[in-house]
């Protein structure tokens, strides 16, 4: 199980990552990583970076049956 410090250090080394990538790298369940990332965000140590829908290749994200699953969410240190 990863610690909050390990998540912070991994973000420092890699720059920005998705929660799923952090989960795989640290071999920790994604709900736990999500909670740690939210904690880092509330402490002002990490920032959530969301892609804008205008980056959608087809331009149909609003009517996408997957509910904007194509939009990625990244995490980085402040």
Swiss-Prot record:
GO molecular function, one term: DNA binding
Gene3D superfamilies xref list: Winged helix-like DNA-binding domain superfamily/Winged helix DNA-binding domain
Binding site for iron-sulfur cluster: 56, 61, 64, 70
UniProt cross-references to Pfam families, sorted A to Z: FeoC
Record keyword Kinase present: no
Keywords for this protein: DNA-binding, Iron, Iron-sulfur, Metal-binding, Repressor, Transcription, Transcription regulation
Domain of life: Bacteria
Function: May function as a transcriptional regulator that controls feoABC expression.
Record-stated family: Belongs to the FeoC family.
Protein name: Probable [Fe-S]-dependent transcriptional repressor
Species for this entry: Escherichia coli O7:K1 (strain IAI39 / ExPEC)
Name of the coding gene: feoC
């Amino acid at each position: 199980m990863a610690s909050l410090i390990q998540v912070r250090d991994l973000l420092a080394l890699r720059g920005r990552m998705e929660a799923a990538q952090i989960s795989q790298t640290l071999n920790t369940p994604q709900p736990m990583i999500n909670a740690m990332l939210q904690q880092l965000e509330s402490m002002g140590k990490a920032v959530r970076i969301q892609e804008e829908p205008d980056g959608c290749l087809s331009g149909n994200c609003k009517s996408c049956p997957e509910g904007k699953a194509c939009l990625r969410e990244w995490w980085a240190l402040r």
